[in-house]
Structure formats: C-alpha cells, structure tokens
Amino acid sequence: MRHYETMFILKPTLVEEEIKSKIEFYREVITKHHGVIETSLDMGMRNLAYEIKKHKRGYYYVAYFKADPSMILELERLYRINEDVLRFIVIKYESKKEVEAWHALVDRANKKPSHAKEKHEKTEHTHSHHAEEAKSTESHSE
C-alpha cells in the first residue's frame, strides 16, 4: 500500500448534515477499497483564495491514508461527478523522504511530536546543557 493525502473543498451552501454525509461517503470509499485512514483534519469553513463557481468560501477536509494505487482512480472519479465538490487534490508520497514527511504530517495532525523534531530537541538540550556547564566552570574558576 502507498501513502496518500487528499483534500477536498465542499460548497458552502451545504448544511451540516450534508457536509457530514459527504465526508463519511469519501471516508467509506477509501475503507471499502481496503484503504486505511491514518488521520484526518476537518478544517471547516474557510475563505477561498479566489472565487470558484461563484463561491468565496468553502468547507475544507483533509485525510491522510494508505491505499492501493488502483483505488485512487475511483476516488478521483467520485470527486469529479459530485457537484458539491468545488476542488480536490490527491497527493502520492513515493520516496523514502516523502513517506517520512507524510508520517510527520500525520503526527502533527494527531498532535504528536514528530520523530525528527524529537531528535532535534534532544540535540538542542544537550548543547544548551554543555553551554551551562561551561558557564558554571568559568564562574568557579574566577
């Protein structure tokens, strides 16, 4: 299975129940095709960068998932035929570096510290600890 991110924007004229049903529909499309949704972000109603189909706002939803490549065509087809979807994008993460970035995005969405950030914080702590030791040694030698 490959790593993917999808984002879609729904029309702002939909009521809350319709928005929830659209989101659930696309989540089910992923899971019915043996995909695994790692995490998702319900970003809510936001201003669009530019007008799309006479709408200045849209409802944003992002999902990070693992799935077989064959399923992506079906997901994109379903986005295209739904008139309530203003825009969509599906991003595939292929290389090792991209997959690591995908994991970092998933961790951030789940509010977990990323692995790279933890390593950086440990290194930073060690450097600041050594700097404090050096200062205390200097003050004792005077």
From Swiss-Prot:
Tell me a Gene Ontology molecular-function term this record carries.
Answer: small ribosomal subunit rRNA binding
HAMAP family in the cross-refs: Ribosomal_bS6 (MF_00360)
Q: Can you quote a single GO CC term?
A: cytosolic small ribosomal subunit
Q: Which UniProt keywords apply?
A: Ribonucleoprotein, Ribosomal protein, RNA-binding, rRNA-binding
**Organism in which the protein naturally occurs:** Helicobacter pylori (strain J99 / ATCC 700824)
Under which name does UniProt file this protein? Small ribosomal subunit protein bS6
Which SUPFAM superfamilies does the annotation name? Ribosomal protein S6
Q: Tell me the CDD domains matching this sequence.
A: bS6
Q: Where is this region: Disordered?
A: 110-142
Q: Which family does it belong to?
A: Belongs to the bacterial ribosomal protein bS6 family.
> What processes in GO biological process is this protein linked to?
translation
